[in-house]
Structure formats: structure tokens, C-alpha cells
């Protein structure tokens, strides 16, 4: 019985620290120092939530830039089902999926001149990625310009405006947040 008391005391102490104090402290500090990020990085227009800056959306219309394909089951970009497809590079099913995506993108973008950018046909590890490279966005300009009656120059400037550089110049690559870019497109129509 004597040896049980220190073990029980340690258990209760660690339970209070790791199950109560630590989560409460991180929640309070997160809300205090980083309220936008701690609440999901929500993009709002007035009182309406239009999306999150961290999670992609399923834009399928010709007048929208499309992001990476989602690997989430049942519903695209479902944050509760986050995860990759887990198909190996050597898996023939992955080849079929990529070939089907390339064919669909070629059909939807007949005026695109170069090869389909790889990030438009491969899902990210989370299946929820909202960023593509500026080159992948530029590849889609002819389709979006035609659907929205906008000039190539207008869309090129919009992509440049919403391109984000990596925090460290030589680590990473510039990206465009598709959700923010498409919301900016909708504002052009207003």
C-alpha cells in the first residue's frame, strides 16, 4: 500500500498537468497571441464565413481556378476525413487516377499550351491542400478568362497579387491560395 501512494499521487499530478493545465494554457495563449489562427483562419465577408485559408474547396466551375485534387473519401476537402490516398507510386490504380485527371483537365483547358502541372493531378498528403504554384494557376488562365470574360493580363495580375513567397527564400516555393484567389475573382464580378 505504501508504494501505491506515490504512484497514485504522480498519476493525479500528471493527469491535472497534461489533461487540464497544459490544454487550458495553450488555448488561452493561442486565443491571446494568435486569435485568427486559433479559430481556424476563417475567411469572412461581413458576417458570412466563406472558407478557411488553410483548407481547400472543391471549385469545379470553368470560371474558377481549381486546386489540387482532394484525397478525402465521399466528400472532397472533408477535414474530418483528412489523409492521403496511400497509393504507392508503383500502384497501377494511381496511374489510372492521374491519367483520368490529366484527360479531364486537358478537356476543360483546351487552350492551355504546356503540360498539365503535376500538382493539379496529384493529391497532397493531407488531401486538403489549398495552395498551388503560380505556374499551375497561370496554366488555367485561358479557361477562367474565357468563362468570366476577363483579360489574361487581369488574371495574371490577380495571381501575382495573391502569390505568397516562402518565409525563407531558398526553402519552399511561391504558392497561391486558391480559396482567396477565387473569392477575389468573385469580387471582380460585383
Swiss-Prot record:
Compartments, record wording: Cell inner membrane
Membrane topology of the entry: Single-pass membrane protein
Keyword Repeat part of the UniProt annotation: no
Keywords: ATP-binding, Cell inner membrane, Cell membrane, Ion transport, Membrane, Nucleotide-binding, Potassium, Potassium transport, Transmembrane, Transmembrane helix, Transport
Molecular function GO labels: ATP binding; P-type potassium transmembrane transporter activity
Pfam families, per the entry: KdpC (PF02669)
Residues that span the membrane, as ranges: 10-30
Annotated S-S bridges: none
HAMAP family xrefs: KdpC (MF_00276)
Record function comment: Part of the high-affinity ATP-driven potassium transport (or Kdp) system, which catalyzes the hydrolysis of ATP coupled with the electrogenic transport of potassium into the cytoplasm. This subunit acts as a catalytic chaperone that increases the ATP-binding affinity of the ATP-hydrolyzing subunit KdpB by the formation of a transient KdpB/KdpC/ATP ternary complex.
Assembly, per entry: The system is composed of three essential subunits: KdpA, KdpB and KdpC.
Name of the featured protein: Potassium-transporting ATPase KdpC subunit
Source organism: Escherichia coli (strain SE11)
Amino acid at each position: 500500500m505504501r508504494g501505491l501512494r506515490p504512484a497514485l499521487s504522480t498519476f493525479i499530478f500528471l493527469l491535472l498537468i497534461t489533461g487540464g493545465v497544459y490544454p487550458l494554457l495553450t488555448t488561452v495563449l493561442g486565443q491571446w497571441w494568435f486569435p485568427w489562427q486559433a479559430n481556424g483562419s476563417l475567411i469572412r465577408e461581413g458576417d458570412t464565413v466563406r472558407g478557411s485559408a488553410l483548407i481547400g474547396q472543391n471549385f469545379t466551375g470553368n470560371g474558377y481556378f481549381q486546386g489540387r485534387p482532394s484525397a478525402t473519401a465521399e466528400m472532397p476537402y472533408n477535414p474530418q476525413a483528412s489523409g492521403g490516398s496511400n497509393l504507392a507510386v508503383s500502384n497501377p490504380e494511381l496511374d489510372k487516377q492521374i491519367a483520368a485527371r490529366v484527360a479531364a483537365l486537358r478537356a476543360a483547358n483546351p487552350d492551355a499550351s504546356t503540360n498539365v502541372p503535376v500538382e493539379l493531378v496529384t493529391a497532397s498528403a493531407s488531401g486538403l491542400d489549398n495552395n498551388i504554384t503560380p505556374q499551375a494557376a497561370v496554366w488555367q488562365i485561358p479557361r477562367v478568362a474565357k468563362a468570366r470574360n476577363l483579360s489574361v493580363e487581369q488574371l495574371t495580375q490577380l495571381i501575382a497579387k495573391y502569390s505568397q513567397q516562402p518565409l525563407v527564400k531558398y526553402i519552399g516555393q511561391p504558392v497561391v491560395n486558391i480559396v482567396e484567389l477565387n473569392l477575389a475573382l468573385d469580387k471582380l464580378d460585383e
